[in-house]
Curated annotation (Swiss-Prot):
Coiled-coil positions: none
Keyword Repeat among record annotations: yes
Cystine residue pairs: none
Composition-biased stretches (Basic and acidic residues): 503-526
Region (Disordered): 449-529, 618-643, 675-695
Name of the protein in question: Protein hir1
Keyword ATP-binding: no
WD repeat residue intervals: 36-75, 87-126, 148-187, 190-229, 251-294, 297-358, 362-403
Gene name in the database record: hir1
UniProt similarity note: Belongs to the WD repeat HIR1 family.
Length: 1031
């Protein structure tokens, strides 16, 4: 196979800034004459040192050329082609050097990505048999073949630190590979059509992909460690933004959509965009991911864009033009080259609204790829007619290239540079760094004071730039901050006077008790005073020096009510569940055949036959002894009281085939829901006495008819009357033809659930908001919170509706997974499942379920599954389980000392996890499981191999709390649990977990601390700078 290399010199004169620009274009035609046809050249790239040009073509070869020989084409003795590799079985569409220069990657239509590396040994083989090519000069060998695509690989991209390689293809997949081990880290299937381009952020925080679904998608990522696996990167590579506006009517005929990121990290040049009816290149701004700049001029779709890797200055750079801060006085500009289906090349600079170079008809077919040399002086292009072009610019044609340090300086504002040195990207990150440094300095002073014997050294934290004493910590558990009061000036338990400062430390009662025990005096026979020794730690290897699990042996008066001292973001069940919870019954698939006649039926038939011997039709009544003939009774006299319950509800036929059945409430004559002036549910006046009437604002009442039908037919019974009262004055009234079982409501709406499974919703003014919502069975639980309504049917289906948007956050979800239906599915008989002791909904529409076995669940609308937030295992195995003491059991809300406009944000999901854990403690103690579980834990601790059992379970418990609080958006709980978890893993020396906590799915420390700080309220954009770091 012969290669014909014929250089041809072209000169293009373009006027820019009142002077002439001369661009020398060397055109080299690569004709592959093996089959008397020229193969398309699809891709090219330049090595980081600028010495090699690599090309990929339709002949299945990856060819490496010497850039020195190309630019110095007048010297025919220099070898132009250094090596050629043929490891693909089809057309090669893309080829890219890694930024560290160590690897070369290629992708082809055989769905394979090949990785090459340069071997220092000379090549051991000559040119291919039957070819006229010169023997190879360099030895490039294939080290890996990456299999992960289902169709052609269209483009490749390396991160700036070479830590990852990303491949895109016609299978709509974006596959991320490790740049160290070349293992597949993640597959992103977010595009709906062919993906034809990828580019990386020079700040190493994002990468962008372009697809035929007419979108450019931005992904945020953190550079993985060299030993990272796919499991480690599950939360990495997150979709940040989807850009659609510039591509809404873009043509789908383009072979590539190769975009490029500017070297200063500010812009993305997206190919194949449109501006009205004409093709253009869209310039997308970083951060906002929008832009109103379009490069217009090409007559056909632009398929490839390439920013020059250097920043340029319009004027020559001199040392005396730099200011004292070592920044160039003149604003730098960037240069971008564009090409596509019109076979023309345009070069633009940011300081000029028009292109400075336009070269037309450079090839017979479309230009497929562009690549700049590292110094920005030469531009290479490939075309589908087999052409490889080299465009060389003289000094000053594009401007004057700045030093690479200017690139690094321009990237520091994004929080990092290519070397990964993280700095604060935003003012929030800077404030956190200052706070962290002040805290570290205070901690060092405290430790030095302790070493030097200074008893006044304390571990104060710094808030708002001022030292603020925090309460002492015990065993990694951070107590709630005490409110300043006069109690702080009273004497301490050991008799010493407290400091006179306005804010003092609240002593730990356990530490004070331990000090008193240590100082307990004893007297010998001769009257001498001695201090009795106290064993504060044992030598047993199975015992932990950390706090033991404190689980109460019995429920005492210290156990508080279900409502903690802080606001619990849950609905209040006043039309509540029965004592002991709502009974549930699970049916297995294996049912015994129903007998036509059993022994009991026989006895009944005998009694019926005996009663009908005289020819009368017997009337039977149900008695404890069974079915007995009815006995006449005296007629009632006087006024009869209205019964509380009229009858049991009629069971829906669908329950006969359901494997889950919940107890259906009885039909009551009078159902009431009352709220106070603040819109919170309260007890109605009839049951709470006169003292509560002043607090009741509105009462919603449903009255079911208790008397007989006026016509004698059951179908003609009286309708149900629903009335809304304010005081004694009715506001509105409505009637329903169906018996009402449950009612609920608040200031946003009122709702009633009927016996036939229908749910009605009214506005506060009495207007029916929607038509009747028909469920598959009777509702057994009906709750509301804000605009949300929760309805649970008798077959265990949970429905959540938003009355403001008339929508549901997720499809109906079954309670079977929560009630361990899988355990009982194969049972031959019905079995009792755990009872539902609490079913609530929070202000975000999340379902919260508490069971009689102590487990607590929340439904995740994003994962479409139940999440177990609390269980008895943590109560006896975790060292951080504490049911009655702050800060875990009775979490104090910090929002009462903050501004009122923060209350709503702070109350989201507040107190849910402590509420579920208190339920776990109570149910565990009531059912006597605590004693047996504690014995099991003690037995495990004494066995070999379980030395770290208690520590592992405690850390897992904190991780479960942390994940639950983050999922629920509970700010106060997340603040506490994150502090406890960070202290514990730091004390245990778990370096891997510490690194994951700090790096996680973000690029550096600021990317994980700033979102957490905003969630916790540490950083508040609305407050002043002095108050921005308030804890």
């Amino acid at each position: 196979m012969d290669i014909l290399y014929r250089p041809m010199l072209l000169s293009i004169y373009v006027c820019r800034a009142s002077r002439t620009v001369l661009a020398n274009i060397f055109v080299s035609f690569s004709g592959f004459l093996g089959e008397r046809k020229a193969f398309e050249v699809y891709s090219c790239d330049v090595s980081p040192d600028g010495s090699r040009l690599v090309t990929a073509a339709g002949d299945g070869y990856v060819r490496i050329w010497s850039t020195e020989a190309i630019c110095g084409a007048e010297d025919a003795n220099k070898p132009k082609q250094l090596a050629s590799m043929s490891n693909h079985s089809g057309t090669i569409h893309t080829v890219r050097f890694s930024p560290n220069g160590k690897y070369l990657a290629s992708g082809a239509d055989d769905k394979i990505v090949c990785i090459y590396t340069l071997d220092a040994n000379p090549p051991s083989h000559a040119a291919s048999f039957g070819s006229n090519e010169a023997p190879p000069v360099e030895n490039w060998r294939t080290i890996r073949r990456l299999i992960g695509h289902d169709n052609d690989v269209q483009d490749l991209g390396w991160s700036c630190d070479s830590s990852i390689l990303v491949s895109v293809g016609l299978d709509s997949k974006v596959v991320v590979w490790s740049g160290h081990t070349f293992e597949k880290l993640k597959t992103l299937s977010v595009h709906q059509s062919h993906v034809k381009g990828i580019t990386f952020d020079p700040a190493n925080k994002y990468f962008a992909t372009a697809s035929d679904d007419r979108t450019v998608r931005i992904f945020r990522f953190t550079s993985p460690a060299p030993n990272s696996t796919a499991h480690d990167q599950m939360n990495n590579f997150v979709l940040e933004q989807t850009i659609t506006a510039p591509f809404q009517n873009s043509p789908l005929t383009a072979y590539f959509r190769r975009c490029s990121w500017s070297p200063d990290g500010l812009h993305i040049a997206a190919a194949n965009a449109v501006n009205g009816p004409v093709s253009s290149v869209a310039i997308i701004n970083r951060g906002g991911w929008d832009g109103d700049i379009n490069l217009i001029g090409h007559e056909a779709p632009v398929e490839v864009c390439a920013f020059s890797p250097r920043l340029y200055s319009p004027q020559p750079i001199k040392k005396n033009q730099q200011d004292s801060h070592d920044h160039v006085a003149q604003a730098p500009v960037t240069v971008i080259a564009c090409a596509g289906g019109d076979k023309s090349l345009s070069v633009w600079i940011t300081s000029n609204p028009r292109p400075i170079v336009v070269a037309q008809e450079l090839a017979a077919k479309s230009i497929s790829d562009l690549a700049w040399s590292p110094d920005g002086s030469c531009l290479y292009a490939t075309a589908l007619d087999g052409t490889i072009l080299a465009v060389r610019f003289e000094d000053g044609d594009l401007g004057y290239a700045m030093e690479l340090e200017e690139n690094e300086k321009s990237l520091t504002k994004f929080g990092t540079n290519r070397k990964g040195a993280g700095i604060a990207e935003t003012t929030d990150g800077l404030l956190l760094e200052e706070k962290s440094k002040a805290g570290e300095l205070k901690g060092v002073e405290g430790r030095m004071g302790a070493l030097m014997g200074d008893g006044h050294a304390t571990g104060d934290a710094v808030a708002n730039g001022k030292p603020t004493p925090l309460p002492s910590t015990s065993n990694g558990v951070t107590p709630a901050a005490p409110s300043p009061s006069t109690d702080a000036q009273k004497s301490q338990p050991n008799g010493t006077a407290a400091p006179s400062a306005s804010e003092t430390e609240k002593p730990d009662p356990y530490q004070a008790k331990l000090e008193r025990l240590k100082q307990r005096p004893t007297y010998t026979k001769d009257g001498k005073k001695r201090i009795a020794p106290l064993l504060v730690s044992g030598a047993g290897g199975a015992e932990s020096s950390l706090p033991q699990a404190r689980l109460m042996a019995s429920v005492s008066s210290q156990v508080k009510a279900d409502t903690p001292q802080s606001i619990v973001d849950l609905s209040k069940p006043f039309d509540g569940l029965p004592k002991g919870g709502l009974a549930t019954l699970l049916f297995g698939n294996k049912r015994k055949l129903a007998q036509l006649e059993d022994e009991e039926d026989g006895h009944t038939e005998k009694r019926v036959a005996l009663a009908s011997q005289n020819g009368a039709t017997p009337i039977l009544t149900s008695a404890p002894e069974g079915l007995l003939p009815a006995q006449p009774q005296d007629p009632p006299t006087g006024q009869q009281p209205t019964p509380e319950f009229i009858r049991p509800a009629v069971v829906n036929p669908c329950m006969s085939v359901s494997q889950l059945r919940l107890a259906v409430p009885k039909v009551r004559t009078h159902i009431v829901r009352a709220i106070d002036s603040a819109g919170k549910p309260t007890e109605p006046p009839s049951t709470s006495g006169e003292s509560n009437k002043s607090r009741v604002d509105v009462v919603f009442e449903a009255r079911n008819p208790s008397g007989a039908s006026l016509t004698g037919r059951a179908a003609d019974r009286e309708p149900v009357r629903l009335t809304l009262f304010r005081g004694e004055q009715p506001l509105w009234q409505d009637f329903l033809p169906r018996t009402v079982l449950l009612v609920t409501g608040n200031q946003n709406m009122w709702s009633a659930a009927c016996e036939d499974g229908s749910v009605y919703i009214w506005t506060p003014a009495g207007r029916r908001l929607v038509s009747a919502l028909v469920l598959e069975a009777q509702p057994v639980i009906l709750e509301c919170n804000g605009p949300w309504i929760l309805s649970i049917s008798a077959v265990g289906m949970c429905y959540v509706w938003n009355v403001e948007h008339l929508s549901s956050p997720h499809p109906p979800v079954s309670l079977q997974p929560v009630l361990d239906a899988a355990i009982h599915t194969l049972g031959a008989h019905p079995s009792a499942a755990p009872s539902i002791t609490n079913a609530r909904i929070n202000s975000e529409g999340r379902i919260i379920i508490a069971l009689s076995n102590g487990e607590g669940y929340a439904y995740s609308p994003s994962l479409y599954t139940w999440q177990r937030l609390s269980e008895a295992w943590w109560a006896v195995g975790s060292q951080y389980w504490n049911s009655t003491e702050a800060p875990v059991g009775n979490l104090q809300s910090a929002s009462n000392t903050q501004q009122k406009d923060k209350d709503a944000r702070a109350a989201v999901s507040a107190g849910i996890i402590p509420f579920l854990e208190r339920n776990t403690t109570n149910e565990t103690l009531l059912r006597g499981r605590a004693y047996f579980l504690q014995r099991l834990i003690k037995t495990l601790l004494s066995r070999e191999g379980y030395e770290s059992f208690e520590s592992s379970v405690s850390i897992a418990h904190l991780e479960n709390r942390l994940a639950g609080a983050l999922s629920l958006g509970a700010k106060e709980e997340f603040r506490l649990y994150l502090s406890m978890y960070a202290k514990r893993i730091g004390a245990e020396g778990l370096r891997g977990k510490v690194e994951e906590l700090l790096k996680g799915k973000h690029r550096d420390l600021q990317r994980v601390t700033v979102p957490y700080a905003k969630l916790l309220g540490v950083v508040d954009n609305e407050s002043d700078a002095n108050d921005a770091m308030e804890l």
